[in-house]
C-alpha cells in the first residue's frame, strides 16, 4: 500500500471555504478504483500565526495505480486548487510506503 500525501498551507481567510470545497473533491475522488481510502487531516501547530496546514492522504493500491493517479486525478485536482484559490493555498506532495501496520 502506498500513501500519497499532499500537504496544503491554507490562508486563514479562505480556510472554511477551502475545507468545504476540498471535502467535496475528495469525496468524489474516493470513488476511484485506484484509491482504497482518502483522509483530510489538520496539523496541530503551536504557531502564533493563524496558518492552517492540512494533509490530504490517499491510500493507493500499487505503483501502477499511483502513476495513473498522478498523471490524471492529481494533476486535475492541483490545477483546480490553483485556479480556484491561487496563492492562498500552497501545496507540496510526498509518497510514503506502508512498511507495517499495527492493530
Q: Positions of the model-derived regions?
A:
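An amphipathic, aromatic/His-enriched active-site/gating alpha helix that lines ligand/cofactor pockets
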Residues: 32-36, 59-94
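Generic alpha-helical hydrophobic packing signal
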Residues: 23, 57-60, 96, 101
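Short amphipathic alpha-helical segments
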Residues: 14-40, 76-79
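Short, well-ordered beta-strand segments in beta-rich or mixed alpha/beta enzyme
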Residues: 2-9, 41-72
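Glycine-rich beta-strand-turn "strand-cap" elements at beta-sheet edges
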Residues: 39-49, 80-103
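Intrinsically disordered, low-complexity regions enriched in Ser/Pro/Gly/Gln/His and often acidic
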Residues: 11-14, 95
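Residue-level signal for secondary-structure boundary sites
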Residues: 14, 64-66, 102
